[in-house]
Amino acid sequence: METAERISAAASAASSRRAKRLAQQAHKTHPVIQAKQNQMYLITTLSPAQVDNSLINRVLPKEVLLKVFSFLDTKALCRSAQVCRSWSILALDGSNWQRVDLFTFQRDVKTAVVENLARRCGGFLKELSLKGCENVHDSALRTFTSRCPNLEHLSLYRCKRVTDASCENLGRYCHKLNYLNLENCSSITDRAMKYIGDGCPNLSYLNISWCDAIQDRGVQIILSNCKSLDTLILRGCEGLTENVFGSVEAHMGAIKKLNLLQCFQLTDITVQNIANGATALEYLCMSNCNQISDRSLVSLGQHSHNLKVLELSGCTLLGDNGFIPLARGCRQLERLDMEDCSLISDHTINSLANNCTALRELSLSHCELITDESIQNLASKHRETLNVLELDNCPQLTDSTLSHLRHCKALKRIDLYDCQNVSKEAIVRFQHHRPNIEIHAYFAPVTPPTDQVVNRGGICRCCVIL
């Protein structure tokens, strides 16, 4: 018996000396390796009884565990909370709920769930996304706004049951709000904009796309009161008229991004107001605003010298008389979408090539008057910058276009759908020289001669087609 005890004591002493030696060596190694060695020593030197009593939540301090939980997303936190009582307390700690995204649970989220979450988060919550949660009502938002006054980022995209009442509570309690997405909240009106404008002066981003009930007055209130607003997204706001910015030009100096896609009532007067007021403008989308003419482009060329992205797809009244002065005045343009601007010719492309040296992406789809000559000029002037070129449905372009584009070093994608005079052989040759460039093209299958179909007696016409 004494011998066994002496052997056990000797083994324990040897183990202790070995552990000490490892610890000394660890000081000379990389910190990560040292940490792993110390961890392995801790695990391997525990007796079975000690292992049973040394769960992770007992070995690691609460502060460390909380830090680990802070890296988990909403779904992982919910799952972790079901492991044990200790983990439930840690997972549901308010400090882990500074950013909450319920998009994954959009179909299941009810008002009661959101209210409970608001009570749990309290003053910790800074970012909340209820994107697509169509079952959420004003009552849930009332709880959130009153209990989470430090909210800075809120997305209510497609929360169609949310009304002006929610915006009233946002203005009353959430004075730190700087990002608000109300896209497709179709019940929102100008009253909501009054509440937001009065109570959220730090707002820098607002998206009220497809909110049909919002009219000029609502947008004007926001621009007048929110001096830090630099991004305004108004896609599909059909209630806006050409005078929406007429009385607030002086309040648009901070605007850098403005999206007016499919605001059908806007005219050259609107663009003139934008150009006069939003002198810091870098991004403008007016696609499908089909009442604007060359006068709009002249105004932008005269005042919007910081413009980098301009989207004008579907603006069919625009032509060379507008784009040429635009190119001369907006020399920082990086992306320009002119799809369906079918009145432009090589003169526009040449002006862009000569003046807009930073141009990276250009869409010329359905610009049927442009030829190989202007593409050659564009390619020679933008060998180092051009990334994307969309040329689908440009019937005058030929194989020469690909020959010119072969030397554009930065090119990543070319669209050539329905360019009848560009051959398969030219595309194959291009891909051989530039295999890393995506080429999107389509060639209709050859229709079989009629006499071949007639000679197939006994086979129905459907089978011949198939």
UniProtKB/Swiss-Prot annotation:
GO terms for cellular component: axon; cilium; dendrite; perikaryon; SCF ubiquitin ligase complex. Expressed in neuroglial cells such as the socket cell and sheath cell, neurosecretory motor neurons and regions around the pharynx and anus. Pfam families: F-box-like (PF12937), LRR_6 (PF13516). CDD domains: F-box_FBXL2-like. LRR repeats lie at residues 122-147, 148-173, 174-199, 200-225, 226-251, 252-277, 278-303, 304-329, 330-355, 356-381, 408-433. Residues 54-100 form the F-box domain. Its main location: other. GO terms for biological process: dauer entry; defecation rhythm; regulation of dauer entry; regulation of defecation rhythm; SCF-dependent proteasomal ubiquitin-dependent protein catabolic process. Disruption phenotype: RNAi-mediated knockdown reduces the rate of dauer formation following treatment with daumone, a pheromone which induces the dauer state. RNAi-mediated knockdown results in a 10-20% increase in the average time interval between defecations in hermaphrodites. It is found in: Perikaryon; Cell projection, Dendrite; Cell projection, Cilium; Cell projection, Axon. Keywords: Cell projection, Leucine-rich repeat, Repeat, Ubl conjugation pathway. Component of the SCF (SKP1-CUL1-F-box protein)-type E3 ubiquitin ligase complex. Substrate-recognition component of the SCF (SKP1-CUL1-F-box protein)-type E3 ubiquitin ligase complex. Plays a role in regulating the entry into the dauer state. In hermaphrodites, may play a role in modulating the rate of defecation. This is F-box/LRR-repeat protein fbxl-1. It comes from Caenorhabditis elegans. The lineage of its organism: Eukaryota, Metazoa, Ecdysozoa, Nematoda, Chromadorea. The gene is fbxl-1.
